[in-house]
Amino acid sequence: MAKQMEKKSARLLAFLLALIMIGSVFAYMLSGGSAEHREVVYRLDDFREYVNWTPADPVYVQYYNLSYTSKLGSKDPLASMVTTDLQKLLIPAIFSRQVLEVTRGISQVMIVDFGETVPLYFVDAGMSKIYFAKEDEIKHGNFTLQVRRPGIALVSELSPLVVGYKPLVEKAVDTVEGNYPSFGNKTYSYLSRINGSFAYAFFAYGDVVKQWIRVGNESPADFFFEGYRYNFNNSSYEKVWAMHFEGNYFFGGMNESEKNFEYYKVQNFGDGLSVAVMEDKNFTKVVNARPNILTWQISFNNTQNES
């Protein structure tokens, strides 16, 4: 009986420690601190630019803006969604104070999934000093990788800092130095036309989009973007969809009977990119909102002269 109680106590202690480790991430993410700075070689400010440092062919990308959600308050449904989702994706092997600490907090995180156990993280900590529990340092290209088991690496000379599975971090360095193809080669021209700030964004390119999005038996698009934000002027929520269509498809208008949300606007570009903005004061309606996908119907009339 005593041994069973010891086992239960050990499991409970491990569970509580895990919660504390994860919780500590959010405790210091937006905290202030001293004015210590780190040396940075290159700096990017916007997640749209982060894709230019991202190695080609990820499965998908997720972006979280903690500075944005802090303006909404913790009880806001959009802020709650962002915090809850992000908390699931920040692994304790990296994002605990025993491993990584940022002196002035974290404002943005972009998570790039390549199908590995540990993804690639782009973490905007400004120019803050970084404390990482490294076990070794190695040179890769012109950068220093701080390394720890099991296969985790961090580059602090970039802003956003790059951390994650060591082979992916090495590829990211190669991408920064122009020695590996960039995901931005395929997506930046689309992302740069999606205006505004976002609390959360999800986007993907290539075969995975063709598998996810179908119109009948066709795969109409090779790029997909979904983003959420708050319109502070109208006190309402917005969802933005963007797709790059390969065929004769585009986002079309809706009449009042077709949509169950307040505001709808579309913009179609000549190269096949379509952007739709859906807005409502009710967050649930925005989550469920979808744009109208239409196709051009082209017909040819063949006439024959009768003699």
Curated annotation (Swiss-Prot):
Lipid bilayer topology: Single-pass membrane protein
Locations listed in the record: Membrane
GO cellular component, one term: membrane
Keywords: Membrane, Transmembrane, Transmembrane helix
TM stretches of this protein: 12-34
Protein name: Uncharacterized protein AF_2048
